[in-house]
């Protein structure tokens, strides 16, 4: 099924250089989509560090369970992704599928099975024909290329209308560091640790425990701060890989000053990808950013912001171009957070509509 490209989509896929120690290839399994790649294989330099954030759902996909276990070792040498089938709610057969695909990747790339990370996205509840996928892996391992980002980003899409990628260059000491990521997401987008699939690669030399801290704290204001339909997916996965190929200075902690520029670059890539996902929300016509100031805490501000963003009445007002500010006040009230009505102000863009608990003098909602 051909999907009409989102009106909020960027004009072109960004030009993104390769990351040393990362190569990839794609293939067509034909399990669901015809004439387009739906398999992605990524080979990573030996001793690559990995960090991840995964869905909090009580019914996670089989690949999510696999990744959760493998993340404990903090090392990766391969990533394999299939689209079209989420491998969720598939019982023991789903777990078998993950194991057999990982074994095939391990054999093709000559790496430990425990260093292979997996992800799936697509229809829930359908058994994954892993035997058909496995036949594609040997050829994929022979066609690995560096900087294959557009094809890689396309292979992991489902109902997306455009592939998503972002890249930044940062400094660690005097070393230039590449940070490049791809993502997919269109439906079931709601902040719950991670939100969709995203894979970020860097050539920085960062231990997995420090990498995990950097990823976890930057998820909060990027992937964890977006919503389209308020539904959290069963397959949400964000993985961050650091090959160490740049031979940069090894940081002593996540707060080491040497990582300041790197963390800014990482956050930029994550925020860019998160916004692209919102722009590709199913049926999306507008991108709205909710800013909350003056709350008792960041946690409180976040809860209020999400109450506004997820409100059906606020969404319909925005969709209809109706500046119904009362619905925003309603959403603040239902958030469950403490709010002083006499101090609430509401602005749409640069226009102040209500201030200190009352509509501003002379405001007219009529067009």
Residue locations for each model-derived region?
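A structural signal for small-residue-enriched, beta-sheet-centric alpha/beta enzyme cores
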Residues: 2-82, 86-99, 106-367
